[in-house]
């Protein structure tokens, strides 16, 4: 049972790390490369979010992450990205 808890904790940490990496990638892209209205920005964002959602779905199916925890990871990332988008469009 302890091994399963360790695996669940590791899965949750990895998903959170991946979400943080997406946020960092988008920050770098906005800082250096493009504007939020650029199709490239939107494509990268959509692709990254899709990939993370698939990771979350897979972890949920394996029983490594509760569905609600997965939703919270996605929701937190969406909120952070929304704040970032607003900051760059208001400049």
UniProtKB/Swiss-Prot annotation:
InterPro entries documented for this protein:
UPF0358, UPF0358_sf
Write down the Gene3D superfamilies for this protein, in alphabetical order. SO2669-like
Which cysteine-cysteine pairs are annotated as disulfide bonds in the entry? none
Query: Which top-level group of life is the source organism from?
Result: Bacteria
Q: How does it assemble?
A: Homodimer.
| Similarity comment text for this entry | Belongs to the UPF0358 family.
Name of the protein described by the UniProt record: UPF0358 protein MW0995
Gene source species: Staphylococcus aureus (strain MW2)
Q: What is the lineage of its organism?
A: Bacteria, Bacillati, Bacillota, Bacilli, Bacillales
């Amino acid at each position: 049972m302890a091994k399963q808890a360790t695996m669940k904790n590791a899965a949750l940490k990895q998903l959170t790390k991946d979400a943080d990496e997406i946020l960092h990638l988008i920050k770098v892209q906005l800082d250096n490369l493009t504007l939020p209205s650029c199709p490239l920005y939107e494509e990268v964002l959509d692709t990254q979010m899709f990939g993370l959602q698939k990771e979350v779905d897979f972890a949920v199916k394996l029983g490594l992450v509760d569905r609600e925890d997965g939703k919270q990871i996605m929701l937190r990332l969406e909120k952070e990205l929304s704040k970032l988008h607003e900051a760059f469009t208001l400049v």
